[in-house]
Amino acid sequence: MTKSIKSNAAKAKQFFADKMAFTTGPVEISHQIEKGEDVAIIDVREAKDFKKGHVPGAISLPQEKWSTMAGLRRDTMNIVYCYAQNCHMGANAAMQFAAKGYSVMEMDGGFESWKENGLKIAK
């Protein structure tokens, strides 16, 4: 039993290290925007939802346009987000973009988390 607990602990450590390397939160992104850091923010929700409100400076790239990679940049980090914590579109987009050689992270909690944190919304 002890060996499997240690194995699980090692797997958990690796999982969370990987998660931290490839995810970021809305507050961190807000600070990056405020400081003028060079990041590309990619909204993978439907275009109609992007028009209702989005992260300031974000580019709309709904699923039907992922193959175009329009708006993605090779010279900086691309941060993708979708609707909410239980939405997997952001992770799916991130996998596809990473497979094409783009540096990419996912925003934890999606746009819902952005709103819950009371951050600025662009329209």
Where are these regions (language model features)?
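Catalytic cysteine-centered active loop of the rhodanese-like fold, especially the PTP/DSP P-loop
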Residues: 72-115
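Conserved beta-strand positions in the Rossmann-like core of class I SAM-dependent methyltransferases
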Residues: 40, 59, 105
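Short amphipathic alpha-helix with an adjacent loop that forms part of the alpha/beta core around
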Residues: 32-33, 66-75
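Flexible, polar/low-complexity N-terminal or interdomain linker segments that lie immediately upstream
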Residues: 1-40, 45-49, 123
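Glycine-rich, highly charged phosphate/nucleotide-binding loops
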Residues: 59-67
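Short loop/helix-cap segments at secondary-structure boundaries that form the rim of catalytic
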Residues: 50-56, 69-73, 114
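Short, hinge-like loop/turn segments at secondary-structure boundaries
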Residues: 59, 77, 121-123
